[in-house]
């Protein structure tokens, strides 16, 4: 995914 995704551990996956 190329959208920021928020996870329960407080981290986020963004465009890399």
From Swiss-Prot:
It is found in: Cell membrane. GO terms for cellular component: T cell receptor complex. Keywords: Adaptive immunity, Cell membrane, Immunity, Membrane, Receptor, T cell receptor. It comes from the Eukaryota. Its main location: membrane. GO terms for biological process: adaptive immune response. J region of the variable domain of T cell receptor (TR) beta chain that participates in the antigen recognition. Alpha-beta T cell receptors are antigen specific receptors which are essential to the immune response and are present on the cell surface of T lymphocytes. Recognize peptide-major histocompatibility (MH) (pMH) complexes that are displayed by antigen presenting cells (APC), a prerequisite for efficient T cell adaptive immunity against pathogens. Alpha-beta TR is a heterodimer composed of an alpha and beta chain; disulfide-linked. The alpha-beta TR is associated with the transmembrane signaling CD3 coreceptor proteins to form the TR-CD3 (TcR or TCR). The assembly of alpha-beta TR heterodimers with CD3 occurs in the endoplasmic reticulum where a single alpha-beta TR heterodimer associates with one CD3D-CD3E heterodimer, one CD3G-CD3E heterodimer and one CD247 homodimer forming a stable octameric structure. CD3D-CD3E and CD3G-CD3E heterodimers preferentially associate with TR alpha and TR beta chains, respectively. This is T cell receptor beta joining 1-5. It comes from Homo sapiens. The lineage of its organism: Eukaryota, Metazoa, Chordata, Craniata, Vertebrata. The gene is TRBJ1-5.
